[in-house]
Amino acid sequence: MRNIRLTKNGIECSDSVSTVYLDPKKIQNQGVHFVSHAHIDHLPNSGDGTILSSTEPNKIAQLRGVTLKNSTDSLENFTLVDSGHIFGSKGLLFDDIFYTGDISTRDRGFLKAAKIPKCKTLITECTFGLPEFVLPPVTEIVKQVNEIIANLYSKGKPVLLLGYELGKAQTLSQLFGDWDPIYYHDSVKKMNDLHRSMGVPLKDSIGHTEAESKGLLDKKPWVMVAPMMSAKNNFIKHMKTKYDVITIGFSGWANSKKFGFSRGTDYSIPLSDHCDYNELIQLVKESEAERVYTIHGFVDEFALDLNKLGFSAQPLREISLDNFC
């Protein structure tokens, strides 16, 4: 029977014997600290306590200058579950509790859809926990973007594909890796090279600094995968001014009317590393959970919708809860 609560240090699941910290901000001296993946907002400050994490986040964290000390990928009575968010991302199943971390239940290139385990208590993210967030199939997105690129290539226009440096950029590198030539922003190249060393089948290429120094960017058209950045960024300004590049930004927020995706890109494409609304609903159904806690996103709205559907759901807040599991 664990008490689940949200604290300033993340989610704590405690009983009289031990505490499990889910994506904590700081590592304590005692307890088990689960790190779901290597996005910066999920990496904890250093500490001496035990860290449970898959091997991939450790290597990615090191590339980003973060060391996960005392880390293991296996502990008795704890099961790591592929979450499909980014490479190496996991959810955690323990004591009939399933914590999703950031999760996606759709295939996207080398990333495979998360499989939802049965549990009594579900702690789920709901980044896109409003009905307006329903994303098109990945096959439809790939077809649309390939048509855009083909049209631009016919006009001699180079293309920048913009997505988060870790996660989205690797997906874009694979989904659109057949275009030639393809280059990578230097930061994306470093991340891609690390992924390739861990077995991810990404096309090898050079970084933008080398490509520019060799005059390769003058030989248009080309495709480049770069981190998400606004039109005001100096890199984008330079690429626009010197090479007349066309930018395509990828985000789950791309089609939102209320929460507009405003980075000043020429095209905005709704591709996400998270579940959309319908996928979140299906996730909850597949878990067969008796109790659902919503975190990260539209927690109140999504919990209300779940209750209307007959589930027992509530947002997880920074107070002790009277509900136990």
Q: Which positions does each model-derived feature cover?
A:
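Short internal beta-strands
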Residues: 49-59, 123, 180-191, 249, ...
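Active-site-proximal loop/helix segment associated with metal-binding centers of metalloenzymes
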Residues: 86-95, 103, 107-108, 121-128, ...
